[in-house]
C-alpha cells in the first residue's frame, strides 16, 4: 500500500483510506461481525486511515471502530489513523438534521467521540458541515483549542464552501 506523509507530526498514512459509514447505516442492513472482519482485512492489506463521524449510526460507527481498536490493543492502534467528524446533529427516527458548529458543541462532540472511540487523541478531526451563522473564527478557534489540548492531532473542514 502506498503511503502519504501526514503533516509534520502525523507520520505516514495509507494513500487509500476506508470510509466506515456504510457499516452502520445508509446502504442497507449492516452486520457487525462482517464489519469487524472488513476492518481487519483492510488492516491486513495495509490500510491505515479509517474515516467515521459522530452522526453515522447515531454514534454506532464510532463505537464499532472503538471496539475494533480495543480488541487489537496498542499495536493495532499504533498502526491506524482515525478520522472523525462533527457538526451534523440528527435525532433518532427522523430524517431532519441540523448543523451545529458552536464552540460548545465542538468541544462536547469531541469528548463524546473520544469516549466512543476509546481514544485519548483523534488523529484527524473535521468539521463535517459548516453553519454560516457561526463565525468561522469561532469554529476554527474551538478546533485549535482541541489540538492544543492534545485531543486532536490535526483539524480541518470537510465539504465546506464558505
Show where each model-derived region lies.
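N-terminal small/glycine-rich loop or linker at the start of catalytic domains
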Residues: 8-26, 83-97, 121, 126
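Generic beta-strand or strand-like secondary-structure segments
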Residues: 64-68, 81, 85, 105-112, ...
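Glycine/proline-rich, positively charged
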Residues: 93-162
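Proline-centered loop/turn at the N-terminus of a beta-strand
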Residues: 79-81, 153-154
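Active-site beta-loop-alpha junctions enriched in small/polar residues
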Residues: 21-23, 53-55, 85-89, 127-130, ...
